[in-house]
Each structure stands twice: as structure tokens, then as C-alpha cells.
């Protein structure tokens, strides 16, 4: 749905330090839209109050995301599209988005720290940390950037299709979302390989 990479490099040229990268993703569960990953390099001694994005209010997430973008040495936000999700499956599409995020960084990388239990296929030392978004600040920063970016996608979708309520459910398969989907049918961006969407498609084929 979007450019698969958005990145910013704030590191002065000529500095050859290798950096620790934090990576996280958002959007594996929704029925619609991209899966989004972010990779972040923070400066040493960064004093941002970071925590798991899911534990922050939307307004607080947006504020901290702006601060991260201002203070990060480098960051990249990357996506895998609904078509890629349907083609690859959600796990492999998520790994692809993470790989794109890491590859979008423009600084030397020493190690990659990923939230979860699996690392993407990147040519660096990589450690997966279960619940890392609540334990490791640089992963928390990636979680916040990814969450804010995906929520912004859902707001754009809400403005185009307000009858679906994307501003409320963010694309997740809530009761409200399933009711709206049954009522209004599919629009571009739905993940056709996901069971609730498949069910709607099968019902439409019978009409």
C-alpha cells in the first residue's frame, strides 16, 4: 500500500562505528493493510522514556515517535504489502518487512536485536528477544515507529472508507470490523488469504 521503505540517516559521514539495531513489526493480525517493520539505531545515552508501543496511548506514541525520529542516528520503516502477505504468508512477509527495514539503514551494523522468537535473513549477528519491545529500549523505539506508521495508514484508509471504522479497529478482526466487512464487502488492501476475508469472498461467490 505504501513505499516499502522510509528512512533517515543522521550520522555524520566518515564515522565508522558499528551500531546495535533494534527491530520490531506491527500488523501481523489485521485483515487489511501492510505489515510494517521498523529498524532503529539510537545514540549512546539516549534518554527517551521508551516502552512497548501497546502500553502507550495513541497521542503519547505519536509524541515519542517524533522524538525518536529527531534523536535517532538512523531509522528505516519498511513494509510488506497485502499481495506479498497473500503470496508468501504472514510470517514470511513479516520477515521480509524486517529485512527491508534493516537493509534501509545507512550505517555500519554490529548486531540486530529483534522482538520475538525469530530473526529475519540479514547478514549480521542477530538475536531474537521474546517480549523485547518491553525490555530493550532500541526495540521499543522500533515498535513505536512501526505502530505509529501503521496507525497512520489506517487513518488514511478510514478517511477514504469511513463506513468501515478503520479508525476504531485499525484493521483487526473485531466484531465491529467483521460486521462492517459483511455489510460493505471488500475494498483494495484486504488480505485475501486470511480466513475471515476468505469467508466473505466465498459468500460473495454464492450470490
Curated annotation (Swiss-Prot):
Job of this protein: Endonuclease that specifically degrades the RNA of RNA-DNA hybrids.
Cofactor(s) the record lists: Mn(2+); Mg(2+)
Principal EC category: hydrolase
Subcellular location: Cytoplasm
Cofactor annotation remark: Manganese or magnesium. Binds 1 divalent metal ion per monomer in the absence of substrate. May bind a second metal ion after substrate binding.
InterPro entries: RNase_HII, RNase_HII/HIII, RNase_HII/HIII_dom, RNaseH-like_sf, RNaseH_sf
Residues annotated as signal peptide: none
Species name: Hydrogenovibrio crunogenus (strain DSM 25203 / XCL-2) (Thiomicrospira crunogena)
GO biological process: DNA replication, removal of RNA primer; mismatch repair
GO molecular function: manganese ion binding; RNA binding; RNA-DNA hybrid ribonuclease activity
Family the entry assigns: Belongs to the RNase HII family.
Keyword list, A-Z: Cytoplasm, Endonuclease, Hydrolase, Manganese, Metal-binding, Nuclease
Protein name, as recorded: Ribonuclease HII
Pfam family, one: RNase_HII
Reaction(s) catalysed (UniProt annotation): Endonucleolytic cleavage to 5'-phosphomonoester
GO CC annotations, alphabetized: cytoplasm; ribonuclease H2 complex
Lineage summary: Bacteria, Pseudomonadati, Pseudomonadota, Gammaproteobacteria, Thiotrichales
Residue numbers binding a divalent metal cation: 24-25, 115
Domain of life: Bacteria
Location, primary (coarse class): cytoplasm
CDD domains assigned: RNase_HII_bacteria_HII_like
Amino acid at each position: 500500500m505504501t513505499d516499502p521503505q522510509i528512512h533517515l540517516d543522521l550520522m555524520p559521514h566518515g564515522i565508522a562505528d558499528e551500531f546495535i539495531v533494534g527491530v520490531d513489526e506491527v500488523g501481523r493480525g489485521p485483515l487489511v493493510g501492510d505489515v510494517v517493520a521498523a529498524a532503529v539505531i539510537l545514540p549512546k545515552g539516549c534518554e527517551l522514556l521508551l516502552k512497548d508501543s501497546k502500553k502507550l496511548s495513541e497521542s503519547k506514541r505519536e509524541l515519542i515517535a517524533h522524538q525518536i525520529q529527531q534523536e535517532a542516528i538512523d531509522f528505516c520503516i519498511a513494509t510488506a504489502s497485502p499481495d506479498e502477505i497473500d503470496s508468501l504468508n504472514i510470517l514470511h512477509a513479516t520477515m521480509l518487512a524486517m529485512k527491508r527495514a534493516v537493509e534501509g539503514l545507512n550505517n555500519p551494523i554490529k548486531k540486530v536485536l529483534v522482538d520475538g522468537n525469530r530473526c529475519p535473513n540479514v547478514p549480521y549477528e542477530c538475536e531474537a528477544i521474546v517480549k523485547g519491545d518491553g525490555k530493550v529500549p532500541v526495540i521499543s523505539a522500533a515498535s513505536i515507529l512501526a505502530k505509529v506508521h501503521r496507525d497512520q495508514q489506517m487513518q488514511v484508509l478510514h478517511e477514504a472508507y469511513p463506513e468501515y471504522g478503520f479508525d476504531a479497529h485499525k484493521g483487526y478482526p473485531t466484531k465491529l470490523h467483521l460486521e462492517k466487512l459483511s455489510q460493505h464487502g471488500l475494498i483494495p488492501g484486504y488480505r485475501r488469504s486470511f480466513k475471515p476475508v476468505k469467508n466473505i469472498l466465498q459468500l460473495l461467490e454464492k450470490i
